[in-house]
Amino acid sequence: EMTDESPDAPLPMELPEWDLSDLYLSIDSEELARDLERVTWDAKGFAAEFKERVGDLDGDALAAAIARYETCQELMGRIGSFASLTYAGNVEDPEIGAFFQDTQEQLNLVGTDLLFFSLELNLIDEDALAHLLECSTALQHYRPWIRDIRVFRPYQLSDELERLLHEKDVAGRTAWVRLFDQTMVGLRFDVEGRSLSSEEALH
């Protein structure tokens, strides 16, 4: 008689799945499509209003701009997290793979529209920024965030190079990560006479 302790006992194949419904119900969710369209247009509107003007804003106006930037970033994070976790949960599904790739490309375009903001913020002189912070209680709320952004100030490249590096991310590092995932999916391992994927074998 075969028992659970027997080497011939069937391996458990049911792996746990993430419940991502707090983010979106599915890759075909209407809410997801609306949010992606919304953040796309919000980013374009943000760029149209503030690009090449960040250094001219007073403290309260800069705080309001940061709040709008933060809203875009949070929505991008929600969409990106859902896409990444959905893909990680089933890298073998070609439909999910295509969804993940398309979402990454669209979010990259949104990020490109927003890229100018942190770059221009870092161009503000230290004394000028200190004055803005002193005169605006609203801006003081974002002091830790501004400090963290400006840590990278000495290493900032020209706007053109920063934009180019950002645009190439989908075809660069991100593409290599996806290639690794797809390669791992294609691997099969013989475990007690059964052909298992790497995920099944590890669990």
What are these regions, as identified by a protein language model?
Residues 1-203:
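A well-structured
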